[in-house]
């Protein structure tokens, strides 16, 4: 057999297998009225007389019935004994009493009855016991809404569901009782009834007064309707005049919008041109062309480092390019200040820039002193770049490059002296930030053969600082000239 809910196979309790015929007949007979009540076609109740002996056996077994075979409680609610098919065997089970009498338990009776039945009917079919059990389960199914048989677990789940339904029904009953009690408590008294009747009569009087007021208002409405007709006619005339006004106003607004669009366009062009002019006036072509800054220990011009350290070796092409930019800066500033170098002709050519030095021979060195003035000056080319093949510290290997850097310092000194003479006349003389004396600038030699790496790098940094000073002076001269021209 299988459980009718979870379809799992069942093992029947031993009490069902050994159920005696008397108890079986009593159970079937007690269930017959319920079965007939559930039938769709009503049948007249059939009288089923019970044998007095069977009745006495049933009463005796019921009095001696012990506890159920399976008994489980859920919380504080005990299980109802009528909700489990297992409890059907309680009518046949009894606790054994300690006695010396021979056993008279239902098991012995069932065995005797079973053996007698088998002896009387030796040809009875083997499935008769199963038919009796199926009949018993059909009776149980007819008495309830649940199909039997069911297992213990499903029975527990069924009992839990019924307990929940019982709790819900109990809460609903309590709620209905509470509402009924409140309704009875809120029943109006005689005084309340009198008060309500008085309020009703007052409301009737107010209603009559309101009806009189309504009649007056209706008469006023009639007169207002006549006045409204006249006002509507006047409104139509005003609508025509308003339409004419808006047509003329829209034409004027269209012309005004065209004029404003043209004005905004002209204003936008003027604003853009003004901003561009102001930007150009504030711009400094010298600072934009020659950006002198620093990168750690190195001075830079346009991002090119000028100097070299043992722990940070700078490539010689970068150094040569930096010298080329610095020489171009001096030439540009000299042209702006209208100054011509004395005895030098700088030729900026990028990484291969050079300085031409003119040496005029002294009169004592010439055999003919009277003709010394006609002798052309001697021309020396100073290369302001190095290939980097020669190591630092060897004086004779860097002589040409050293002479070129000394010549560069001389150009800076001459230009600084010229600026000093010009500004001295205005009362605020300007001088180079560092003093230049031969191959030294600020007591640091610029020659590679004499100075170490850090000394030469420092001398290059001081040189670019002086160049930045000259560049700033040229920018001020340009700004002053522009401001004076605009005034």
Curated annotation (Swiss-Prot):
Residues 283-480 are annotated as: BARA. Residues 33-129 are annotated as: Disordered. Disruption phenotype: Significantly decreases the radial growth of colonies under nutrient-rich conditions. Causes only mild infection in point-inoculated spikelets of flowering wheat heads and impairs the spreading to nearby spikelets. It is found in: Endosome membrane; Vacuole membrane; Preautophagosomal structure membrane. Residues 456-481 are annotated as: Required for membrane-association, autophagic function during starvation and normal autophagosome morphology. Residues 52-62 have a biased composition (Basic and acidic residues). GO terms for molecular function: phosphatidylinositol 3-kinase binding; protein-macromolecule adaptor activity. It holds the Pfam family APG6_N. Residues 152-282 form a coiled coil. It comes from the Eukaryota. GO terms for biological process: autophagosome assembly; cellular response to nitrogen starvation; late endosome to vacuole transport; mitophagy; protein transport. Residues 81-94 have a biased composition (Polar residues). It is a peripheral membrane protein. Keywords: Autophagy, Coiled coil, Endosome, Membrane, Protein transport, Transport, Vacuole. Belongs to the beclin family. Required for cytoplasm to vacuole transport (Cvt), autophagy, nucleophagy, and mitophagy, as a part of the autophagy-specific VPS34 PI3-kinase complex I. This complex is essential to recruit the ATG8-phosphatidylinositol conjugate and the ATG12-ATG5 conjugate to the pre-autophagosomal structure. Also involved in endosome-to-Golgi retrograde transport as part of the VPS34 PI3-kinase complex II. Autophagy is required for proper vegetative growth, asexual/sexual reproduction, and full virulence. The C-terminal domain called the BARA domain is dispensable for the construction of both VPS34 PI3-kinase complexes, but is specifically required for autophagy through the targeting of complex I to the pre-autophagosomal structure. Component of the autophagy-specific VPS34 PI3-kinase complex I; and of the VPS34 PI3-kinase complex II. This is Vacuolar protein sorting-associated protein 30. It comes from Gibberella zeae (strain ATCC MYA-4620 / CBS 123657 / FGSC 9075 / NRRL 31084 / PH-1). The lineage of its organism: Eukaryota, Fungi, Dikarya, Ascomycota, Pezizomycotina.
